[in-house]
Amino acid sequence: MSTGSAGAGSGDGPPGLVETAARGDARLVADLLDGGADVDERDDSGRTAVTAAVYAGSAPTVRLLVDAGASVDLQDDSHANAFLALGETGNVSVLDEVLRGDPDVGLTNRFGGTALIPAAHRGHVEMVRALLARTEVDVDHVNDPGWTALLEAVILGDGGPAHTEIVRMLLEAGADRDIADRDGVTPLEHASRSGYDDIAALLTSR
């Protein structure tokens, strides 16, 4: 696979920077950078090495790339970048390294959502906690389907302990429980319809 950029690699040649970062091989990443590889090189999908390293969960590789000047904001063809990938993976072990790159937390994924929304959807309790405590991510951002993180946690969650805790944290962070979806259905109404009694109780308490 080749993007035509230096160090991109090909099926017949050595792996490029992005592929190497996706393997979490910090030592070889360092060698490639020392050899002149572009730290913001992209693969055929537009993905950068630092984004690949976040998906790989390799904190040393992310640290190395950020220290070398990699942009954590560059988005690939699916609109993913290093910061947005955190919401998908929930891997808090790489959060510190991504934050060192001063990410734009307002950038959105292919669904128009911030990193907080998929983290809430997927039940990534510790990632939601960290994003709320350590970034200025908008707790009430509405994505393209018309859902906030609170709505997403209720609608796409399973009503279990993880999603209940996420709802609690979002409310404590000031999430607006009255923001409804495009059909005018509130988080409380969704929780009640789904039989998520613990979540409904949180949403009725003030």
Predicted regions and their residues:
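Conserved ankyrin/ankyrin-like repeat signature
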Residues: 28, 60-61, 93-94, 126-127, ...
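Ankyrin repeat domain, specifically the short helix-to-loop turn at the C-terminus of the second helix
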Residues: 30-38, 63-71, 96-104, 129-138, ...
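Ankyrin repeat A-helix N-terminal signature
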Residues: 19-24, 52-58, 85-91, 118-124, ...
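Ankyrin-repeat-protein effector appendages
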Residues: 1-16, 162, 172-173, 182-185, ...
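Eukaryotic tandem repeat interaction scaffolds
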Residues: 90-146
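Intrinsically disordered, low-complexity regulatory segments in ankyrin-centric signaling systems
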Residues: 1-35, 44-47, 67, 117, ...
